[in-house]
């Protein structure tokens, strides 16, 4: 097996390292590197090895490790250049730092859709919170005990299931007082209108829970693959909802009015490199509004004069702020930062 010194020589001969000696004020523990790490190929290799250990990365061959190192190095340079721009957020060496942006998009974002033609059309008159105009300046459903720990969808395009389940977990806690971790795998296997690990619908997954209920994740654990539906074989009670409704599109007031009352299933454009490598702070792009990823809005607030929405992601706790992102609101775009106001749904349980 090749030694680290031989890897260093191979990479050094194959590539020309461009040294960036910026004066980034980012803390090492925030972004995962220091400026000293950029001064030599040896320091970069040491950084890569420590990053691999932290994120449990194992590669099948020395060629694969060299290839991943080169992507890691390129991403690090992009991170460092971005962090010098005095943005309201930091990028960092998260678990996606060895993936090209194309690889990242293929594995972790993709097909999600807000509507399924076989279901009822919802108009603004059906919106529960249309008369809510006086809502608190901030709310965090995590602090209210209505949010389960951050989960990880893995290399399965099941974000739609995680987003739906998080909203059902939230409304179940709000109505019954019980916070239960529910089964995303049941939706992946059993929502026949969605496509398992290849994407899915907010609407049909919510309708599935309304029609059938959903088991806890302990009874029906997540496996990051689609299998035959086994819901009828599982014991124990299910959590059900009465139905679901849509938040009027492209309206921040309606969005915040609903979010003040419960977590929301939302879609965003998450395929850009800044979103991939986000570490902390209030994210304001660049990103577009071509929706490709489902997340859960679990609160909103203000920090240092910057207003934001708290979104819970399904990429594990090593992405972002322990699995969360603060997404800028009042962006000047009616669709919201990354299109967050375009497609939002919420379940209801025992009230309309």
UniProtKB/Swiss-Prot annotation:
CDD domains: Peptidase_C1A. Disulfide bonds join 156-197, 190-229, 287-338. Pfam families: Inhibitor_I29 (PF08246), Peptidase_C1 (PF00112). GO terms for biological process: proteolysis. PANTHER family: CYSTEINE PROTEASE FAMILY C1-RELATED. Belongs to the peptidase C1 family. This is Chymopapain. It comes from Carica papaya (Papaya).
């Amino acid at each position: 097996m090749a030694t680290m010194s031989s890897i260093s020589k191979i990479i050094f001969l194959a590539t020309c390292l461009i040294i960036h000696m910026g004066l980034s004020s980012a803390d090492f523990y925030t972004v995962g590197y220091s400026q000293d790490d950029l001064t030599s190929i040896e320091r970069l290799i040491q950084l890569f090895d420590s990053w691999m250990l932290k994120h449990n990365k194992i590669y099948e061959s020395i060629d694969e490790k060299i290839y991943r190192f080169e992507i890691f190095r390129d991403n690090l340079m992009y991170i460092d250049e971005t962090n010098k721009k005095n943005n309201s957020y930091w990028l960092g060496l998260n678990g996606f730092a060895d993936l090209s942006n194309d690889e990242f998009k293929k594995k972790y974002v993709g097909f999600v859709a807000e509507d399924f033609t076989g279901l009822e059309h919802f108009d603004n008159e059906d919106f529960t919170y249309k008369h809510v105009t006086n809502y608190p300046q901030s709310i965090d459903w995590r602090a209210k005990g209505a949010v389960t720990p951050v989960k990880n969808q893995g290399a399965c395009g099941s974000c739609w299931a995680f987003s739906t389940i998080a909203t059902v977990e939230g409304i179940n806690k709000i109505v019954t007082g019980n916070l239960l971790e529910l089964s995303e795998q049941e939706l992946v296997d059993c929502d026949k209108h969605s496509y398992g690990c290849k994407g899915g619908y907010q609407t049909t997954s919510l309708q599935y829970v309304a029609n059938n209920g959903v088991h806890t994740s302990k009874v029906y654990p997540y496996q990051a693959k689609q299998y035959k539906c086994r819901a009828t074989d599982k014991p124990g009670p299910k959590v059900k909802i009465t139905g679901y409704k849509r938040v009027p599109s492209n309206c921040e007031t309606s969005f915040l009015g609903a979010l003040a009352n419960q977590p929301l299933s939302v879609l965003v454009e998450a395929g850009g490199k800044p979103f991939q490598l986000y570490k902390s702070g209030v994210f304001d792009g660049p990103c577009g509004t071509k929706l490709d990823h489902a997340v859960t809005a679990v609160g909103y607030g203000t920090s240092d004069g910057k207003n934001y929405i708290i979104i819970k992601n399904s990429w594990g706790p090593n992405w972002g702020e322990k699995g969360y992102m603060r997404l800028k609101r009042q962006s000047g775009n009616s669709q919201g930062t990354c299109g967050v106001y375009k497609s939002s749904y919420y379940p209801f349980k025992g009230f309309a």
